[in-house]
UniProtKB/Swiss-Prot annotation:
Its main location: membrane. The keyword Transmembrane helix applies. Transmembrane component of the tectonic-like complex, a complex localized at the transition zone of primary cilia and acting as a barrier that prevents diffusion of transmembrane proteins between the cilia and plasma membranes. Required for ciliogenesis and sonic hedgehog/SHH signaling. The chain crosses the membrane at residues 23-43, 262-282. This is Transmembrane protein 231. One of its GO terms (biological process) is cilium assembly. Part of the tectonic-like complex (also named B9 complex). Interacts with TMEM107. It comes from Bos taurus. Pfam families: TM231. GO terms for cellular component: ciliary membrane; ciliary transition zone; MKS complex. It is a multi-pass membrane protein. The keyword Membrane applies. It is found in: Cell projection, Cilium membrane. Keywords: Cell membrane, Cell projection, Cilium, Cilium biogenesis/degradation, Glycoprotein, Membrane, Transmembrane, Transmembrane helix.
Amino acid sequence: MALYELFAHPVERGYRAGLCSKAALFLLLATALTYIPPLLVAFRSHGFWLKRSSYEEQPTVRFQHQVLLVALLGSEPGGFLAWSTFPAFNRLQEGHLRVPLVSAREEDRNQDGKMDMLHFKLELPLQSTEQVLGVQLILTFSYQLHRMSTFVMQSMAFLQSSFALPGSQLYVNGDLRLQQKQPLGYGGLDVRYNVSVINGTSPFASDYDLTRIVAAYQERNVTTILTDPSPIWLVGRAAEAPFVVNAVIRYPVEVISYLPGFWEMIKFAWIQYVSILLIFLWAFERIKRFVFQNQVVTTIPVTAMPQGELYKEHLS
């Protein structure tokens, strides 16, 4: 009757030596060289600790219906028309004040509960002798992020265009993009910039100076800007026709930079450490097997006895 091998298992062999022997010292050294160098290699590879991370999020953006407009005229030096939604600013303009017709509509194109774009239109009435050569426009927004930390701020889109020829309409189509000078936190509530971009209650003209408004805004570490506006300046205005500003501002998905939390840093470091450690475990396992099998250090080889045989020997 032919016999076949149906099952097999390796015979475990142990190696005994004193705690103060060369074999014990070698095993201690091999263990240290197995676990410590992978940590040093991962650390020295620059990127062991995750100092900054990023994620994508569709921000919650809402137009606050706050507008500040300055239209530059070419009829006389220093000529301009101005208007805003702030009564204190309008009172300061005196003869330069001109009230436009404004309409604004926000649109949620993908029906996810968050607005995706703003359609803004402003019609500024002009006299037949008035000609517009440039426009400065500020629109303010409420800007919120919720995925990691809850970040709330009041931001703005600043548009400035000037041309050599008098225009009848300015068309703008751009994105309201987030700009970060420093990463956000990974959790908590951040409302440090949840303050008005324009101090609309101030009676002082200096608080409405565009240079000061933009300079103070740029001091923030987190801002929004209107990117790729692609302004189109249309010329040829009828005598009684208004000057029109047409703007389409999209609220795109943003890549948010943030400071990772403790456990995220540990997870990232652990993955790097273990990937290198596996190589060292494989290498030193074979080194230890060679050293003990060939008696490079003096030990007493002992063949491990199966559990059943140990039990029988104990009973006898």
